[in-house]
Amino acid sequence: MKAFGGYHPAVTFTYFISVLLTAMFVWNPVIQLTALLGGIMFSLMLVRKKAVLSDMGFYLPLFLLVAVTNPLFSHNGVTPLFFMNGNPVTLEAVVYGVFISVMVVGVLFWCKCDNEIMTEDKFLYLFGRIIPKMSLVLSMALRFVPMFKRQMKNVSRAQKAMGLYSQKSYVDRLRGGIRVFTAMISWSLENSMELSSSMRARGYGLHGRTNFSLFKFGARDAAVLLSGLLLFAAVLIGVGSGSIDFTFYPELGKISLSLKSLITYISFFILSFLPFFIEVKENLKWKYYISKI
C-alpha cells in the first residue's frame, strides 16, 4: 500500500523537502541515524522486502567504500589508532567516514521513497503552471531511471531469445552488454524527443491552458501538512539554537542531551517516521475491515 501517496502532492512534496534538507545539512549523529532508520522503514512499507534487500546489496559496499576511504586520505584528528605508511589513521577520521556513509545511504533511501510517492503527474501538477519546462524536465528525470531499467531488461531478454551472447564467456557477456547499452542510448534519446514533441503538440506550457486534476486538498491533508511543518520548525529551532551541534575535528564532541536537544531529536524522529506510522495505521485499518467481511 501507498497510503502516504494518497495525500495531496503539496503535502508530500513539502514533507520530503523537509526531511531531505535535515538529513543533508544537519551534521548530528542522532539526526542521521534517525533519518537512515526512517528511510529504511518507509521503504519497507512502499516496496517489496526483496527490492529493499537488493538496494542494501548496493548501498552496503558504498557505505564501506566511503567509510574506509575517508580515514585513508584524511589524517585530521588528535586520536591516532594506528599508522599506515607513516600516516596516522585517526579515530575522528574513522567516525567522520562512518557518519558520511550513514548520511549518503539515508539520503538515497529517502530519494527512493520520494521517487515512489512523487510521480511525474504530481510534479506536473505542482509546477506545470509556474515553471512548465523545468517541471517537465524534472518529471522526465524522475521516471527515466525506472523506465531505463525496465527497458534494459526487455532488450536483454529479447536479444537472449534471439540466441545472442548465449555463451558463458566473459568476452561474450561484455559484447552483449555493450550491444544492450548502445540500444538503450538510442532508445532514451528517441523517447525523450517523442515525449517533448508529444507535450508540445498538446499545448503544454501555453498561456491559458487548463489542466485536469484529481488532486483535492482536504482536512486530512491540512492536518498532515501542519503537523509536518510544526515538527520541521521545531527541528530548525533546535539547529538554530546550536543545541544539537556536534564536532568531529580536531576531536570528537559529545552528543548533547539537554532539554532543547531532546525536543529536537524527538521532533525529527516523529517527522521521519510520520509516513511509516500512516502506512501502519492504514494497513491495520485495512486488515480490520477485511476481517469484518
Regions found by a protein language model. Name each.
Residues 1-5, 47-51, 84-96, 217:
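Membrane-helix interfacial "entry" motifs
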Residues 27, 46-47, 74:
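Short helix-capping/hinge motifs at transmembrane helix termini and TM-loop junctions
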Residues 41-49, 117-118, 276-281:
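Structural signal for the C-terminal ends of transmembrane alpha-helices
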